[in-house]
Amino acid sequence: MDRETRMRRIWETILEIPRGRVASYGQIAEIAGIPRGARQVAYALRHVPKDMTLPWHRIITASGKSAFDPLSRHFRMQCERLTEEGVTVRNGKVNMQEFRWQPDLDELLWKPSSMWDES
């Protein structure tokens, strides 16, 4: 699978995360069909087209923390956006047991989408 296809799959997977839920980099990679691809998710997030609105703030580490420096503008923005969606952020951390996105497998497999269209 080429880089463009991987990035498209990652972006489309991220678009499926509902408000008030979060996912880890590794979880997104697995759902997008890129096992052990957490770093590729980070790469795709750094290369989102300017005209694409992506809920990037819903992607956090597997431990529930933001990947951004706690003193950075992006860290503050991520925490603010998650809080606005009803996600509790305490000391820069989200309780993954409570807020982790648990997608329905049937929906992921059978929902009409261009996600798996290789053409």
Give the predicted meaning of each segment.
Residues 1-119:
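Nucleic acid-binding interface residues in structured DNA/RNA-binding domains
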